[in-house]
Design a protein with these regions (language model features):
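Key DNA-contact positions within bacterial/archaeal DNA-binding proteins
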Residues: 46
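Amphipathic alpha-helical packing segments from all-alpha helical-bundle domains
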Residues: 82-122
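Tryptophan-centric aromatic hotspots in well-structured domains and transmembrane helices
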Residues: 51-53, 126-127
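Basic, helix-initiating cap at the start of DNA-binding domains
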Residues: 1-42, 53-57
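Solvent-exposed, amphipathic alpha-helical segments
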Residues: 15, 19-27, 89-96, 124, ...
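Hydrophobic alpha-helical connector segments
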Residues: 61, 68-95
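Extended low-complexity intrinsically disordered regions
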Residues: 77-81, 120-133
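DNA major-groove recognition helix of helix-turn-helix
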Residues: 52, 62-63
Length: 133
């Protein structure tokens, strides 16, 4: 079966993610605009939507790319994550997850490496982070 449409540029993913990363660092999740990401990446907004279904999906992918998977003690790794440069983005995604099942699923997937069966280490750390924002 032939692929229709223009072929995807391999470097476009990185350009889009780099533009989104810059915006998240500049103003956090609320400042992330797909129109502006497209402008900065030199691509069409539709190209972003072909790769990521939503603003939340793009932000989650940036966090996934930029934040290493936890090693060692999960609570310490999660605390470092929430107090690091992406803590505010993750807190915003968690807020968005209250309104959207799709975002909730992405957040659960994003935080899965920090979950320990039978051990609620995330709750108190996350609660403190949300109170500080």
């Amino acid at each position: 079966m032939a692929i229709r449409g223009r072929p995807r540029r391999a470097e476009a993913d990185a350009e889009i993610l780099d533009a989104a990363l810059a915006m998240l660092r500049e103003g956090g999740y609320r400042a992330l605009s797909l129109d502006e990401v497209a402008r900065r990446a030199g691509t069409a907004k539709s190209s972003i939507y072909r790769r990521w279904a939503s603003k939340a999906a793009l932000a989650a992918e940036v966090v996934r790319r930029e934040v290493p998977a936890p090693e060692g003690e999960v609570a310490a790794a999660f605390e470092a994550l929430m107090n690091g440069p992406f803590g505010g983005v993750i807190a915003s995604l968690i807020g968005e997850a209250q309104e959207s099942a799709e975002t909730r699923s992405m957040v659960l997937d994003l935080l899965a490496p920090y979950r320990v069966a039978g051990d609620d280490v995330l709750g108190p750390i996350l609660f403190r982070r949300l109170l500080n924002d």
